[in-house]
Curated annotation (Swiss-Prot):
Cellular location(s): Secreted
Alphabetical GO biological process terms: cellular response to palmitoleic acid; glucose homeostasis; glucose metabolic process; positive regulation of protein secretion; response to L-arginine
GO molecular function: hormone activity; insulin-like growth factor receptor binding
Keywords noted in UniProt: Carbohydrate metabolism, Cleavage on pair of basic residues, Disulfide bond, Glucose metabolism, Hormone, Secreted, Signal
Main location: secreted
Gene name for this UniProt entry: INS
Cysteines paired by S-S bonds: 31-91, 43-104, 90-95
SMART domains: IlGF
Biological source species: Ovis aries
GO cellular component, one term: extracellular space
Protein name (database record): Insulin
Propiece span(s): 57-82
Amino acid sequence: MALWTRLVPLLALLALWAPAPAHAFVNQHLCGSHLVEALYLVCGERGFFYTPKARREVEGPQVGALELAGGPGAGGLEGPPQKRGIVEQCCAGVCSLYQLENYCN
């Protein structure tokens, strides 16, 4: 019984020093392989939605150059189009586990 009374305060101190699980993943910048690893962690067996497309595959290279130069198709006074992808959300900005779950299958 004496050993038990010595271990209780030690275990209590260890419990206080351990990081809280809720704070283990705070909103973070996640880029490249770190972003992919976080998606694997969050999505698990469900997998995640990933279809890489370079801008040149979607539209011709001249269109992108004209938009950057302010030529036809640049959007007029509206400004640049808003990007809503996971890279813009989690790498350029910060995202949470709940936001990452939106990209799971």
